[in-house]
């Protein structure tokens, strides 16, 4: 029954061919040992799959490592080719494009800077003219104000004199009107 070598008789076989001795129900210690050994072999054949699974695992790991190693080599080779292509073709093109674009951009930037500088100068000149005009206007207004204040007492005196004359005329007129009214009230 065992798969690896000599077979040992099982308890039933030992009882049949063992002479004529009567055995008890459990049998002898040697027979029990044989039964346990046979049960262990049956158990290992039916239920213990460790040797098979270990072999499969070793095979899977070996295949995986071989395929992975080849895949990594291919990936590294592709990366190397891409880097070489980039260094040989793409990088010079990018440099040329960048140089051309930068020169044009710098020229435009310089032109914009010059025009802004001119605009700032014009604005400063315009502000200076406006400030000069405002300063001159302010000085002129101050002179006019001072002249006005100097002429004010004379004008006030003239107005006061004119007012006094008008008051005198009104008094005389009212006095004359009272006389005329007194003439008419005697009737």
Swiss-Prot record:
The superkingdom listed in its UniProt entry is Eukaryota
Instruction: Choose any GO biological process term that the UniProt entry carries and state it.
Output: positive regulation of pigment cell differentiation
List the keywords (alphabetical): Acetylation
Region described as Disordered: spans on this chain: 1-27
The UniProt entry's sequence similarity note says:
Belongs to the BLOC1S5 family.
Q: What does the subunit comment say?
A: Octamer composed of one copy each BLOC1S1, BLOC1S2, BLOC1S3, BLOC1S4, BLOC1S5, BLOC1S6, DTNBP1/BLOC1S7 and SNAPIN/BLOC1S8. The BLOC-1 complex associates with the AP-3 protein complex and membrane protein cargos. Interacts with BLOC1S4, BLOC1S6, DTNBP1/BLOC1S7 and PI4K2A. Component of the biogenesis of lysosome-related organelles complex 1 (BLOC-1) composed of BLOC1S1, BLOC1S2, BLOC1S3, BLOC1S4, BLOC1S5, BLOC1S6, DTNBP1/BLOC1S7 and SNAPIN/BLOC1S8.
Please identify the protein, giving its name as recorded: Biogenesis of lysosome-related organelles complex 1 subunit 5
- Organism expressing this protein natively: Rattus norvegicus (Rat)
Q: Gene that codes for this?
A: Bloc1s5
């Amino acid at each position: 029954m065992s798969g690896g070598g000599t077979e040992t008789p099982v308890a039933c076989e030992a009882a049949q061919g063992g002479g004529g001795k009567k055995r008890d129900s459990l049998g002898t210690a040697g027979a029990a040992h044989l039964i346990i050994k046979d049960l262990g072999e049956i158990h290992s054949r039916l239920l213990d799959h460790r040797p098979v699974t270990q072999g499969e695992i070793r095979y899977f790991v070996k295949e995986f490592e071989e395929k992975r190693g080849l895949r990594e080599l291919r990936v590294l080779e592709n990366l190397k080719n891409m880097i070489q292509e980039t260094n040989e073709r793409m990088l010079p093109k990018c440099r040329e494009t960048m140089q051309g674009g930068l020169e044009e951009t710098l020229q435009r930037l310089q032109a914009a800077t010059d025009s802004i500088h001119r605009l700032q100068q014009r604005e400063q000149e315009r502000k200076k003219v406006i400030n000069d005009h405002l300063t001159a206007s302010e000085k002129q207004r101050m002179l006019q104000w001072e002249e006005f204040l100097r002429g004010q007492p004379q004008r006030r005196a003239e107005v006061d004199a004119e007012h006094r004359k008008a008051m005198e005329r009104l008094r005389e007129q009212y006095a004359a009107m009272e006389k005329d009214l007194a003439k008419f009230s005697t009737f």
